[in-house]
Curated annotation (Swiss-Prot):
GO terms for molecular function: hydrolase activity. It comes from Listeria monocytogenes serovar 1/2a (strain ATCC BAA-679 / EGD-e). HAMAP family: UPF0173 (MF_00457). Keywords: Hydrolase. The keyword Kinase does not apply. The keyword rRNA-binding does not apply. It comes from the Bacteria. This is UPF0173 metal-dependent hydrolase lmo1577.
Length: 228
């Protein structure tokens, strides 16, 4: 399995002949190396409804026929407002089997709304995501602040990789993300959600260097991947 990083919180997981795209903020994202019109994933997974995470989901899903996995409120909105047909609605605490493995949604402390036709639309609770693929557990924290139940996430799902936001202002900053890494006890921690905008400018290498002894961290450059 290969996991690659594409700026902000966009990651791509390739397992066998299946491609999973997470939070595909591509258009308008100078830090992303992908082109929306070239993406043909089998699945799109969304952590929440903010525009910098839903991103190009509608265009990509319509072009590819991808199944979109997300919280049920966001799923309803995308189906009714944007005409998406292949939806897999879930909610926090639930898990579901797919052809590639299992998805479980966890809590995240953040918001989840958009503005459509001049009105503010709330799009359900933001989530984190635990993927179980090829007997590996990958935690994608989404946008969140630090919370103590991250310890429980790590206990219930021994983690091979954890993707954590470090941008501060809208999510955890580096200091809290380092605590989150200690709570989660993942084999590898990868920072995300930084340097896309001035308000979330951070040094990811400094974050990795700050991790407690025994916690491995890796900065993925745009387009770079890891094999697990």
């Amino acid at each position: 399995m290969k996991i690659s990083f594409h700026g902000q919180s966009c990651i791509k997981i390739i397992t066998g002949d299946t491609t999973i795209l997470v939070d595909p903020f591509i258009s308008g994202n100078e830090k992303c190396d992908l082109k929306a019109e070239e993406q043909m994933p089998d699945f799109i997974v969304l952590s929440h409804g903010h525009d910098d995470h839903v991103g190009d989901t509608v265009e990509i899903a319509k072009n590819s026929g991808a199944t979109v996995i997300c919280n049920a409120d966001l799923a309803s909105f995308l189906a009714v407002e944007d005409g998406l047909e292949n939806m897999a609605p879930m909610h926090i605490g639930g898990k579901r089997q797919f052809s590639f493995g299992q998805v479980k949604l966890t809590q995240a402390f953040h918001g989840s709304q958009t503005v459509r036709d001049g009105r503010i639309v709330n799009l359900g609770f933001p989530t984190g995501i635990v993927f179980t693929i090829e007997d590996k557990n990958i935690y994608f924290a989404g946008d969140t602040g630090l919370f103590s139940d991250m310890k429980l996430i790590g206990e219930l799902n021994p983690l091979d990789v954890a993707f954590l936001p470090i941008g501060d202002n809208f999510t955890m900053g580096p200091e809290d993300a380092a605590i989150a890494a200690r709570f989660l006890q993942a084999k590898l921690v990868v920072p995300m959600h930084y340097n896309t905008f001035p308000l979330i400018a951070q040094d990811p290498h400094k974050f990795v260097a700050s991790l407690n002894e025994g916690i491995a961290g890796k900065v993925l450059e745009i387009g770079e991947g890891i094999e697990i």
